[in-house]
Amino acid sequence: MKTKEMRDMTNAELDQRLAELKGELFNLRFQLATGQLENPLRIRNVRKDIARAKTIIRENELKQARA
C-alpha cells in the first residue's frame, strides 16, 4: 500500500490496517521458521508498511495536538 493511500485513511482504518499487518508479519515469521516461506522479501515489505502506518498515526496525533 502506498503512503499516499495510507494518509487518506482515518485513524480507525489505520489502526485496523496496522493490526492486519502485525498478524501478517506473525504468519510470515511462522512460515519462515517452518521453511514454508516462498518470498522472504515479503517480511521486509510488511515491516516497512507497519512503520509507515505507525508514522502516519503519530503525525495525525501531533497534528491534532497542535490544533
UniProtKB/Swiss-Prot annotation:
Gene Ontology terms describing biological process: translation
Cross-referenced Pfam families: Ribosomal_L29 (PF00831)
Key words, A-Z: Ribonucleoprotein, Ribosomal protein
Keyword Ribonucleoprotein in record: yes
Gene Ontology cellular component annotations, sorted alphabetically: cytosolic large ribosomal subunit
PANTHER family, alphabetized: 60S RIBOSOMAL PROTEIN L35/50S RIBOSOMAL PROTEIN L29, LARGE RIBOSOMAL SUBUNIT PROTEIN UL29C
Full protein name: Large ribosomal subunit protein uL29
